[in-house]
A protein has these predicted regions:
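Src homology 3 (SH3)-mediated interaction modules
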Residues: 1-126
Length: 126
């Protein structure tokens, strides 16, 4: 099975050292929407963890939201030249794994899709 891979074109340092990990059905308090990245909302879970959540992951009613799928907000630190395995995408960010099986999100504008010879890039899922 061919899997989509990306190469890191700009270094990325995670903005947060922690993550919000939520399961489908979990509820959150929904705060402000990010003005620079529309569709991302500042949310607080039942444990008090606050983090940005893409609107595609939560059903929002007023100031409350419910996850419509599992979500892990962990960002992935990456250096130029690293390769990552695509897992998903939401509002300008790519969910991925690196060659060390580290999981996280990287802004899509810091990545370029591998078009040729992607099969020669190590695949953390194989």
């Amino acid at each position: 099975m061919k899997r989509l891979k990306y190469r890191v074109t700009k270094d990325h340092q995670a903005s947060f050292a922690y993550a919000m990990i939520s399961a489908e059905g979990d509820e959150v308090s929904v705060g402000r929407e990010d003005q620079e990245m529309p569709g991302w909302f500042w949310c607080r879970d039942s444990k008090g963890v606050e983090m940005w959540v893409p609107s595609s992951y939560i059903d929002i009613e007023g100031s409350r939201g419910k996850f419509n799928q599992n979500y892990n907000s962990m960002e992935l630190n990456a250096k130029v030249g690293d390769f990552v395995q695509f897992l998903g995408e939401a509002l300008g960010w790519v969910e991925c794994l690196n060659h060390e099986w580290r999981y996280g999100w990287i802004p899509k504008d810091k990545l370029t899709k591998i078009q040729k010879n992607a099969s020669q890039i190590p695949d953390p899922l194989s």
